[in-house]
Curated annotation (Swiss-Prot):
Annotated stretches, region: Disordered: 1-81
Protein name in UniProt: Der GTPase-activating protein YihI
Family membership noted in the UniProt record: Belongs to the YihI family.
InterPro entries: YihI
Subunit composition and interactions: Interacts with Der.
Keywords carried by this UniProt record: GTPase activation, Ribosome biogenesis
Intrachain disulfide bonds: none
NCBIfam families: PRK05244.1-1
Biased composition (Polar residues): 60-71
Length: 189
């Protein structure tokens, strides 16, 4: 025969335990301190409330009906909300009032002006330009973009040299030879 666990069931015959009795907690008396028994009972009630979480069983379908009824019963306060229509899509953030137009600001592109001498030095020391010029000297053909870049850089170099008054003319060999012959070597000793 299987063992059966003994349980104590509260019935009319048996005296009720203090734990089983519901204790009415005095709410209005603040000056009186609660006894240990009342504090325990209150703690038990709080624990029962905390223990029960979530929705009641079967409330999934009835919850929507209750919400609809509750909303219908609630009176709308005419002071709440605005009657002004709110656009759902923002088309113009800073739209001016009717008749008030804001003139558009003219943005001038500011080009940082370098010193012509410094710019000329940068163009002459440009490695990409030097490589392309070496390729041209070797007889290779350049792509259209590279050729355009080389032409633009050379035009700018010529323009800067004109501004600065630098001449590109090489002295003829005869002039160099004459100056070499005229130089007194004793000056350099």
């Amino acid at each position: 025969m299987a063992r059966k666990k003994k349980t104590r069931r509260v019935s009319d015959i048996m005296p009720a335990r203090k734990v089983d009795k519901k204790v009415e907690l005095p709410k209005g008396k603040q000056g009186k301190k609660l006894t240990r028994y009342e504090l325990d009972a209150k703690a038990r009630e709080d624990k029962k409330k905390k223990k029960r979480k979530g929705l009641a069983s079967g409330s999934r379908h009835s919850a929507t009906e209750n919400n609809n009824n509750h909303q219908a019963l609630a009176k709308k306060d005419p002071r709440l909300g605005s009657r002004k229509k709110v656009p759902l899509i923002v088309e113009f953030v800073n739209k001016p009032e009717k008749g008030m137009t804001i003139p558009p600001m003219k943005v001038e592109e500011k080009v940082a002006k370098l010193d012509p001498m410094l710019e000329l030095e940068q163009l002459e020391n440009n490695e990409c330009l030097n490589q392309l010029l070496d390729a041209l000297d070797a007889g290779k053909t350049l792509s259209a973009e590279d050729q355009q870049f080389v032409d633009d850089c050379l035009d700018r170099i010529a323009q800067l040299m004109d501004e600065l008054g630098i001449s590109e003319d090489d002295d003829p060999e005869e002039d160099l030879l004459r100056t070499f012959e005229k130089i007194d070597i004793n000056q350099f000793r």
